[in-house]
């Protein structure tokens, strides 16, 4: 890729205007004064942006400007270097052409400034392509180690430069994508280039089986587009259903240890079962001991004389059976106790030594007061009835006193 990129725009600044040295003041010019044109830059006429009216009949003086480098400023790179190498006209002014060293455009700010000044046409694509083919220190996780890659392409960066480059990359034709990743990995053998640079991998060279099985089926870096850069030849491959069996047989045939290659193989192999121990032959049965020699039979003992039989012994007298013990006599129950007569409690007589007569008298007096007819009689004959009541009360009191004393 060429290291030169261009940006094209229309100059608006007149800060670079200069004097054409044409006389214009009175007494210095006349109608016959020659008109002086604008100068040139790189063989192209400078920008004539206007005229200045001169004295009386003198011809007007042209206003000219050189290309302004400020119209091309996109900022310095990460090493504080200005990428602008030359400013000239694009045919003629005010069409300006800015020439840059693309290798000094390596910051997001420069990319944004270039886009704002010149748009996404022209060499913007080349600027982004060169920027994205540079390496980054902010990387995604390497699935092989479980830690972040120490260095990677900007396509695998986890910062904003990664977002920019992935967006640009996905908009490119497949042929351009292949060229970009191959150019990057040819210069930078970073961990995300394990698929593109797989020919440098010892495990790949050990197990490569020609073109029978696509590398995107069995070689792990080529089967993981999220972590590694891929070319179109290994993307979305058609894989045979038994490709893991084929790889397993190749590993066995080439006497390769599975543990040494399992991280690079896109298959899950079960560990080999431990070797079965060889059966031990059964021990020889013990030999039976030899039969001992049979001893000579002992001589038979001489016959003994038969003793005479014992005389019969007299039989003992029979023992009489024991007499049964009579049962003990039953206890005599005590005679029954006759019931005792319960004395009849006498009903106590009514005690007449009370004020019964007086109470009766008081009750009669109250009855006379309570009943309406009695109140009427009392109200009509008050004094007479009061006298009668006093006499009756005295008689009742006397009768009660007699009863209490003599009865």
Curated annotation (Swiss-Prot):
Keywords: Membrane, Transmembrane, Transmembrane helix, Virion. This is Putative membrane protein 047R. It is found in: Virion membrane. It comes from the Viruses. Signal peptide: none annotated. Residues 265-337 are annotated as: Disordered. Belongs to the IIV-6 337L family. Its main location: virion. Residues 271-337 have a biased composition (Pro residues). It comes from Invertebrate iridescent virus 3 (IIV-3). Coiled coil: none annotated. One of its GO terms (cellular component) is virion membrane. The chain crosses the membrane at residues 355-372, 385-403. It is a multi-pass membrane protein.
């Amino acid at each position: 890729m060429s290291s030169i990129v261009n940006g094209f725009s229309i100059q608006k600044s007149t800060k670079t205007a200069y004097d054409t040295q044409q006389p214009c003041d009175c007494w210095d010019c006349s109608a016959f004064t020659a008109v002086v044109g604008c100068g040139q830059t790189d063989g192209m006429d400078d920008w004539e942006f206007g005229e200045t009216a001169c004295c009386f009949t003198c011809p007007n003086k042209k206003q000219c400007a050189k290309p302004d480098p400020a119209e091309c400023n996109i900022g310095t790179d990460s090493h504080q270097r200005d990428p602008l190498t030359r400013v000239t006209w694009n045919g003629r002014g005010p069409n300006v052409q800015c020439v840059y060293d693309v290798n000094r455009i390596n910051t997001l700010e420069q990319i944004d400034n270039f886009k704002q000044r010149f748009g996404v046409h022209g060499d913007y694509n080349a600027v982004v392509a060169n920027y994205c083919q540079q390496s980054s220190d902010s990387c995604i996780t390497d699935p092989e180690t479980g830690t972040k890659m120490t260095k990677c392409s900007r396509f695998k960066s986890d910062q904003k430069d990664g977002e920019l480059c992935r967006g640009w990359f996905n908009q490119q034709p497949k042929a351009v994508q292949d060229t970009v990743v191959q150019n990057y990995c040819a210069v930078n053998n970073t961990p995300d280039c394990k698929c593109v640079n797989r020919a440098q991998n010892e495990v790949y060279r050990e197990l490569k089986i020609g073109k029978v099985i696509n590398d995107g089926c069995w070689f792990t870096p080529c089967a993981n587009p999220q972590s590694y850069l891929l070319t179109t030849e290994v993307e979305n491959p058609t894989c045979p259903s038994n490709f893991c069996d084929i790889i397993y047989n190749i590993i066995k045939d080439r006497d390769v240890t599975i543990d040494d290659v399992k991280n690079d193989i896109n298959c899950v192999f079960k560990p080999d079962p431990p070797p079965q121990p060889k059966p031990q032959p059964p021990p020889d049965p013990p030999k039976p001991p030899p039969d001992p020699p049979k001893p000579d039979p002992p001589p038979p003992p001489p016959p003994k004389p038969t003793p005479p039989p014992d005389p019969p012994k007299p039989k003992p007298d029979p023992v009489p059976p024991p007499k049964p013990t009579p049962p003990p006599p039953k206890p005599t129950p005590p005679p029954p106790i006759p019931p005792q007569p319960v004395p009849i409690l006498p009903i106590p007589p009514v005690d007449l030594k009370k004020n019964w007569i007086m109470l009766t008298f008081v009750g009669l007096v109250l009855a006379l007061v309570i009943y309406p007819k009695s109140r009427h009689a009392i109200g009509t004959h008050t004094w007479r009835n009061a006298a009668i009541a006093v006499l009756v009360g005295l008689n009742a009191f006397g009768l009660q006193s007699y009863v209490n004393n003599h009865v």
